[in-house]
Amino acid sequence: MRMIENNTYTSPFSDMLNSSASPLQDQFGRTFNYLRLALNEQCNLRCMYCMPEEGINFRHKDKLLSAEEIFRLLKLSSQMGVSKIRLTGGEPLLRKDLVPIIQYANCLDGVNSVHLTTNGLLLSKYLNSLEQSGLSGLNISLDTMNADKYKIITRRDGLKQVLDGLEKAIDSS
């Protein structure tokens, strides 16, 4: 979300993203080293436990964090001791700037793993790019191996696509 100040757009996170970093700690002094970042809310499935089949008013992409804002957030997080990053959504593979985000996260001092949670529908299409980006690992959300049940749960026909992507990912590892 961006706000207008003096005819310029700013993020509500600007103060935080421009401040100096100290370790993230809870009230007991435990340091957090893990960041889970939802990159979007859009999804190419309509799982019955997650969202309605239709009538969803997603935020416009201009109201989501831009790649530049995500880069600053990732940098600040790494400066605060975050070493593990998990990128989620919605469906993060729908985000066109996903690969540069993964590459940037991998270049940060102290970050030693970047993982992605996906429903796997687009995995075959983007697997080579994900491998080249330096992605550390994948978590594929898959509720069933039965095609009929998959179609009922997700309200989409796509189990074969997911399994093909999963097989390609296993073969390439």
Task: Outline where the language-model segments fall.
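Conserved alpha-helical substructure of the radical SAM core
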Residues: 5-113
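Radical SAM/AdoMet-radical enzyme domain recognition
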Residues: 71-86, 95-173
